[in-house]
C-alpha cells in the first residue's frame, strides 16, 4: 500500500527528517513511501487518502490534522494522547491506538485499511463554537482577580 508522509519539517526537525528518509530507504520502502514536503493542498491529500495516521510520539495540544481528516470523512488513527486522543475519543474511537503497543497498533491499522468503519457525518468542533469558547475563557481570565 503506497503511503505519503505529508508536510514539511521545521529547521529544528531536519535531522529527524533525514533519519526518517534514511530508514525508509534502508528498509527498501522508498518506492512505497513518498515524502511530499510542505504543501498548500494538504486538504486534497487528506481527502484522497484511505486512512490518515497521526503518530506523533509527543502529545499534540489540538490535533488539527486529525480533525480535518475526520471532517472529510477519512478514517483516521492516532495515539491516544493529547488532542488527537481527545478528538478520536469523541468522533472516531475506532482509530484510537495505544502509544507504545506496536503490535496492537499494526493490527488496528490493518483492520481500518481492510474494513474501515464509516466516519460519522457531523460538524464536530465547529469553528464558531471553538472561537466563542476561547474568547469566553479569555474574558473570564481578564476579569479574574490578580494574585
Show where each model-derived region lies.
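A charged, aromatic-enriched C-terminal amphipathic alpha-helix characteristic of glycosyltransferases
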Residues: 114-146
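Active-site donor-binding acidic/aromatic loop of nucleotide-activated sugar
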Residues: 12-17, 30-39, 45
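Active-site donor-sugar recognition loop in glycosyltransferases
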Residues: 41, 57-61, 83
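Glycosyltransferase donor-sugar binding loop
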Residues: 1-18
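Short alpha-helical segment that forms part of, or immediately flanks, the ligand-binding pocket
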Residues: 43, 66-71, 85-86
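Acidic donor-binding loop of glycosyltransferase active sites
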Residues: 47-61
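Conserved acidic donor-binding segment of nucleotide-sugar-dependent glycosyltransferases
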Residues: 90-103, 111-114
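Short hydrophobic beta-strand element within catalytic cores of glycosyltransferases
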Residues: 75-78
